[in-house]
Regions:
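Acidic, serine/threonine-rich low-complexity disordered tracts
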Residues: 1-55, 75-171
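Acidic/charged, solvent-exposed loop-and-adjacent secondary-structure segments enriched in E/D, K/R, S/T
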Residues: 56-75
Length: 171
């Protein structure tokens, strides 16, 4: 399974842009294991990268903040299938850093999107990465909450069609 991620975050305050974050990421997965990654990102104009490939004995990463081999089964930080909640190591798709995380189910709640209410289950991610993740009743990832430079940010998936959780289950 090939996953392509293209992100641009440009928050504005009083009409002024105060930062810009971009990420272009290509991941190849097979049997729920990452085979390769090629990611480039920019934050406040500084460039970051991650390149990696599965090899005998683990997954070799060359990144702007970490280079080495990870032997554990891990997740990445660009897409959040519910299976990732069981994995204790997540690799930053910004700079390659292995992140030790813990997960905790919070609660079910309602969120509104396009004038329609949805029931979601919210999870807290803590440790080297702090965020909340939301999944709908079909286990599709539909939202996130995190902090960007001291400011709370909320992400809600605009298009619920073609969510890759079904594809992930069969990969």
């Amino acid at each position: 399974m090939e996953v392509l991620v293209d992100v641009e975050i440009t928050p504005k305050f009083l009409g002024l842009k105060f930062m810009k974050y971009t990420l272009e990421n290509r991941e190849v997965w097979k049997n729920k294991k990452l085979i390769s990654i090629d990611a480039n990102s920019s934050w406040f104009g500084k460039r970051y990268y991650v390149k990696g490939r599965r090899e005998e004995g683990g997954f070799r990463i060359e990144g702007s903040a970490f280079s080495g081999v990870i032997k554990d089964t891990f997740a990445t930080t660009s897409y959040f299938t519910p299976d990732f909640l069981k994995r204790r190591i997540w690799v930053s798709t910004q700079d390659g850093t292995p992140l030790e995380i813990k997960t905790r189910k919070l609660r079910n709640r309602k969120v509104s999107f396009n004038d329609k209410d949805y029931s979601v289950t919210e999870w807290e991610i803590s440790g080297d990465l702090e965020l909340t993740l939301q999944y709908d009743q079909h286990k599709n990832w539909v939202g996130s909450g995190f902090t960007v430079g001291n400011y709370p940010a909320r992400f809600i998936l605009n298009n619920r069609k073609n969510n890759i959780h079904k594809i992930w289950q069969n990969s």
